[in-house]
Regions:
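Phosphate-binding and adjacent anionic-ligand microenvironments
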Residues: 1-154, 159-163, 170-176, 182-190
Length: 190
C-alpha cells in the first residue's frame, strides 16, 4: 500500500494538543508555519491551520460540512468516500483501553506494571529514555502481524491507558488483529 502518495510529512507526537502546538511553534521558528496542514489525536480532536492551538470542534464541523457538500455534488456519500480510502490505504482501527487500579495499592500495581512492561522483549520504544520533547512515561509496542499499542499511566486518574491500533486488508482482518493485540497486551498487564 502507498500510505503517503502526496508526500506529506507526518510528525508523531505524544497524545495532547499541547504537543501539536509545540510542533507548530517549531515550524514558526523556521518560518514554515504555513506548511502545517492538519493535527489530530486519538480522542477525535482536530485542528486545521495555525490560528487555534487546541482542539477546534467548530472548524472540524465546517470542514466536514464542506467535504459533504463537495462529495454530494459528485453523488458520493462520506461513507462511500471513507470506504474508498480504506480500500486504497488499508483499514486502520483504533481502540482506547482503560485499566483501573484504584487506591494506594492500585498506584503501586500501576508502577509495577509499567516497570515490568519496560522489561518486555516486545518493547519498541520507551519515551522515558527520550531526551527531546517526547520525554514521558509512555511505552510503545509495535508487534508484527498484530499492530501497535501505546501504554501510559493516566496523569489524573488511577488507571493505565492503552491506545491500540491495528491495520488490515479489510475490516474483518483489522478487527481480528485488534483482538489478538488486545489479548496479548492485556496478558502482559497481569
Amino acid at each position: 500500500m502507498n500510505l503517503n502518495p502526496v508526500r506529506v510529512t507526518v510528525i508523531d507526537t505524544l497524545t495532547g494538543f499541547k504537543f501539536i502546538g509545540d510542533q507548530i511553534a517549531i515550524l514558526e521558528e523556521k518560518g514554515r508555519e504555513d506548511s502545517f496542514i492538519f493535527g489530530f489525536e486519538e480522542s477525535c480532536g482536530y485542528l486545521s491551520g495555525t490560528y487555534v492551538r487546541d482542539k477546534d470542534a467548530v472548524n472540524a464541523a465546517v470542514l466536514i460540512a464542506d467535504m459533504a457538500d463537495y462529495y454530494k455534488d459528485k453523488d458520493i456519500s462520506l461513507l462511500d468516500r471513507l470506504e474508498e480510502l480504506y480500500k486504497k490505504f488499508g483499514y486502520l482501527i483504533s481502540y482506547l483501553g482503560n485499566y483501573e487500579y484504584p487506591g494506594t495499592a492500585g498506584l503501586s500495581k500501576m508502577r509495577s506494571i509499567m516497570e515490568n512492561l519496560r522489561k518486555s522483549t516486545l518493547l519498541t520504544k520507551d519515551y522515558l529514555n527520550e531526551t527531546d520533547m517526547l520525554h514521558a512515561d509512555v511505552l510503545k509496542f509495535d508487534i508484527k502481524d498484530f499492530g501497535t499499542a501505546i501504554v501510559r499511566p493516566s496523569g489524573t486518574e488511577p488507571k493505565i491507558k492503552i491506545y491500540y491500533f491495528a491495520e488490515g486488508c479489510d475490516m474483518i482482518d483489522a478487527k481480528e488483529k485488534m483482538k489478538k493485540l488486545t489479548v496479548l497486551i492485556e496478558r502482559m498487564l497481569n
